[in-house]
């Protein structure tokens, strides 16, 4: 079976490279073709990479607390670019301060994200979810 392709990166003005490398390593070892666009990445770069690579999913991370602002509108931009239905995952420290996680998760799902991960979620959880969502295994 052909490897599924994912676009991975750190959204917005966030430069946390270590977590991004860990995710890249974990998803690559799990059998995915990872297109890592790195840190400090605007939405348009994720979209362009997804189109160019015919990606099956876009995985965004954020650690600096501004993920909610950075992630807003991505689903609509994906749809407008012809990426209707592409899986969108986001995780990390995606909001400012300590907030009730179910409320945070709901806000991101309302923005069109398929999966939303709290700080400290092991990569294996995202890998299992992605395999399930892509009907792998």
From Swiss-Prot:
Subunit-level organization: Heterotetramer composed of 2 epsilon subunits (GlmE) and 2 sigma subunits (GlmS). GlmE exists as a homodimer and GlmS as a monomer.
Class in the EC hierarchy, top level: isomerase
This protein's encoding gene: glmS
Cofactor needs: adenosylcob(III)alamin
GO function terms (MF aspect): cobalamin binding; metal ion binding; methylaspartate mutase activity
Organism field: Clostridium cochlearium
GO BP annotation list: anaerobic glutamate catabolic process; glutamate catabolic process via L-citramalate
This protein's name: Glutamate mutase sigma subunit
Role description: Catalyzes the carbon skeleton rearrangement of L-glutamate to L-threo-3-methylaspartate ((2S,3S)-3-methylaspartate).
Regulation of this protein's activity per its record: Competitively inhibited by (2S,4S)-4-fluoroglutamate, 2-methyleneglutarate, (2R,3RS)-3-fluoroglutamate and (S)-3-methylitaconate.
Organism superkingdom: Bacteria
Residues bound to adenosylcob(III)alamin: 13-17, 61-63, 93-97
Catalytic activity: (2S,3S)-3-methyl-L-aspartate = L-glutamate
Keywords: Cobalamin, Cobalt, Isomerase, Metal-binding
Metabolic or biological pathway: Amino-acid degradation; L-glutamate degradation via mesaconate pathway; acetate and pyruvate from L-glutamate: step 1/4
């Amino acid at each position: 079976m052909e490897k599924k392709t994912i676009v991975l990166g750190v959204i917005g003005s966030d430069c946390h490279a270590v977590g991004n490398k860990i995710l890249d390593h974990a998803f690559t070892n799990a059998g995915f073709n990872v297109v890592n666009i790195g840190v400090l990445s605007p939405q348009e770069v994720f979209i362009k990479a997804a189109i160019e690579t015919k990606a099956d999913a876009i995985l965004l991370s954020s650690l600096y607390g501004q993920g909610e602002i950075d992630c807003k509108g991505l689903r609509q931009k994906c749809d407008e670019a012809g990426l209707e239905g592409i899986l969108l995952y986001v995780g990390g420290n995606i909001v400012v301060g300590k907030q009730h996680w179910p409320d945070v998760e709901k806000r991101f799902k309302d923005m069109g994200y398929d999966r939303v991960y709290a700080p400290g979620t092991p990569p294996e959880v995202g890998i299992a979810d992605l395999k399930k969502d892509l009907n792998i295994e």
